[in-house]
From Swiss-Prot:
Residues 1-340 are annotated as: A. The lineage of its organism: Bacteria, Pseudomonadati, Pseudomonadota, Betaproteobacteria, Nitrosomonadales. This is Chaperone protein HtpG. Its main location: cytoplasm. It comes from the Bacteria.
Length: 628
């Protein structure tokens, strides 16, 4: 270690840390007990990490393989100490783990806070505050740590005001000691019974023993003795019988594995025996974490082998579209030295993943069927992620599709409550397709001119405005034998929903307007693939549609916004022969004026579907000329 690092240094927190600390102290003050839960949870993680690293290097245990967490307090000094003999931290790890919040989206998260204490408490809980929660009850925190395998210790200290000090320290053994110097008015925590009841309430399920000194009554007060007692049950909750676990225990264990403040929506606890032996305890959260849409973020499944922690972001155990699932899988078959590479090619893991996915889908189906209000909450939080499923998981495509919910013209609100099953139950007699439209906003979808004939005939259309919807409909082309059909692509063929007389009249109109169609095509040139008469419009003069096998206008815009190349397919302009503007066009003989009218029709249709004009100045000039 260089001489520079052997002296005391004062370093500044990241700006976001400073802001978060202040917000947290105010927002979470009513839930002070979570401080102990968070710090014990971190100590438990440190022990898990030591066990895992010791699989490759047993010498890391030294002479101390009996892992535990110790909680003590000092009434005179007004301190609480949480100690563990886990992995410990090096100086660099202290800076990275405690001086920084190494999470993408931190600024955005902070901007989303409202100033409403109850709401902000939930948001901060979703963010996961961990160590920083200490400052809710402490005005100074001292952390002394020594990494397993190292002889050097480091002391970190801060009042949470904006900077912290780091200096070399003396520590006889590996692990971490955290001393909380309590704020004025927090003396309720300097009480043996209070601390033990908090530990039993929040941390009973921690697999490590959490020890405190036994206390006895002496001179009218409780005083600690020299004898240790284990405060928690210290057994793997998931390994116990379901009938022995209370709802509260399940909920507290969820908060431990997920670092969430809210109770989960539902969970599934299973012991599998036979070809593979494993236990799974899987939870569906009730709130989405702030970084849900970051596909690179850590997954939420902790993998254990025979109760030994292996890793806490085992992405091989759950597909991307279920990345919100939290929980534990404990296998009896995998080798203890299992690596990520082995996991990628393990048949056992593949079988566990397949079964776990089915379990999660069953949980969701059960919610949707028996607790629709709860499922509506789930959908609001995680629906857009579930929509990634049909494109990722071919084997379960139909089951996932059955869980999807959409807005539609049935209620004409942006609430996504319509399932494919609901839609099919309301289909018109003779209707063969499930109709939908994609757009970049609900308003654009709801007011699209493409819906006019469907509204007139009372045919329901799904209104898809999430970015993921384009990806969804490209991979989900039918449901329950019914084709999914975009109302903005290809020829409009309503099949049996139109009678022969209507079709006959349409054919006559197309023939009558053929010369006008050809003139508009000539005026627009390469801007369009084709011009044709439409019967999908009742109020608008024109609309743009994509060819049956072309990208929709909305998808093309999404890809361009993401910086991706597009095939550059041209749209089809459809004109409404019953509209006054189109009828007047037939009588325009001035070719320059006619060309302006044709371009205006095209530009208006482009704007109506949410597109951007290539030449806004030319559009304004033409509009001004018409108004003059």
């Amino acid at each position: 270690m260089s001489t520079e690092t052997l002296q005391k240094e004062t370093l500044g927190f990241q700006a976001e840390v400073k802001q978060l600390l202040q917000l947290m102290i105010h927002s979470l003050y009513s839930n002070k007990e979570i401080v102990l839960r968070e710090l014990i949870s971190n100590a438990s993680d440190a022990a898990d990490k030591l066990r895992f690293e010791a699989l490759a290097d047993n010498s890391l245990y030294g002479n101390d393989s009996d892992l535990k967490i110790r909680v003590s307090f000092d009434k005179q000094a007004r301190t609480i100490t949480i100690s563990d003999n886990g992995i410990g931290m090096s100086r660099e790890e202290v800076i990275n783990n405690i001086g920084t919040i190494a999470k993408s989206g931190t600024k955005e998260f902070l901007q989303s806070l409202t100033g409403d204490q109850a709401k902000d408490a939930n948001l901060i809980g979703q963010f996961g505050v961990g160590f920083y929660s200490a400052f809710i009850i402490a005005d100074k925190v001292t952390l002394t740590t020594r990494r397993a395998g190292s002889n050097e210790a480091v002391r970190w200290e801060s009042t949470g005001e904006g900077d912290y000090t780091l200096e070399p320290a003396e520590k006889e053994s590996r692990g971490t000691d955290i001393v909380l110097h309590l704020r004025e008015g927090e003396d309720e925590f300097l009480n043996d019974w209070k601390l033990k009841s908090i530990i039993r309430k929040y941390s009973d399920h921690i697999t490590l023993p959490i020890v405190m000194k036994k206390s006895e009554w002496k001179d009218g007060e409780q005083v600690p003795t020299d004898e240790d007692e284990t405060v928690n049950k210290a057994s793997a909750l998931w390994a116990r019988n379901k009938s022995d676990i209370s709802e509260q225990e399940y909920q507290e264990f969820y908060k431990h594995v997920s670092h969430d403040f809210e109770n989960p929506l539902t969970w599934s606890h299973n012991r599998v025996e036979g070809k593979q032996e494993y236990i799974s305890l899987l939870y569906i959260p009730s709130k989405a974490p702030f970084d849900l849409y970051d596909r690179e973020r850590q997954h939420g499944i902790k993998l254990y082998v025979k109760r030994v922690f292996i890793m806490d972001d085992a992405e091989q155990l759950m597909p991307q579209y279920l990345r919100f699932v939290r929980g534990v899988i404990d296998s009896a078959d995998l080798p203890l030295n299992v690596s990520r590479e082995i996991l990628q090619h393990s048949k056992d893991i593949e079988a566990i993943k397949t079964a776990s996915v089915k379990r999660v889908l069953s949980m969701l189906e059960d919610l949707a069927e028996n607790k629709p209000e709860e499922y509506a909450k789930f959908w609001k939080e995680f629906g857009r992620v579930l929509k990634e499923g049909p494109g990722e998981d071919f084997a379960n495509k139909e089951r996932i599709a059955g869980l999807l919910r959409f807005a539609s013209t049935h209620a004409d609100t942006d609430e996504q409550v319509v399932s494919f099953k609901d839609y099919i139950a309301r289909m018109k007699e003779g209707q063969e397709a499930i109709y939908y439209i994609t757009a970049d906003s609900f308003a654009a979808a709801k007011h699209s001119p493409h819906l006019e004939i469907f509204r007139k005939k009372g045919i329901e259309v799904l209104l898809l405005s999430d970015r993921v919807d384009e990806w969804l409909v490209s991979s989900l082309t039918e449901f329950d034998g019914k084709k999914l059909q975009s109302v903005a692509k290809g020829d409009l063929d309503l099949g049996k929903l139109e009678d022969e007389a209507e079709k006959e009249q349409q054919k006559k109109t197309e023939d009558e307007y053929k010369p006008l169609v050809e003139r508009i095509q000539a005026a627009l040139g390469d801007s369009v693939k084709e011009v044709r008469v439409t019967h999908r419009l009742t109020d608008s003069p024109a609309c743009l549609v994509a060819g049956e096998h072309d990208l929709s206008g909305n998808l093309e815009r999404l890809l361009k916004a993401a910086g991706q190349k597009t095939p550059g397919s041209k749209p089809i302009l459809e004109i409404n022969p019953d509209h006054g503007i189109v009828q007047r066009l037939k009588d325009v003989t001035d070719e320059a004026k006619f060309a302006d009218w044709a371009h205006l029709l095209f530009d208006q249709a482009l704007l109506a579907e949410g597109g951007q004009l290539e030449d806004p100045a030319a559009f304004v000039r033409r509009v001004n000329a018409m108004l003059a």
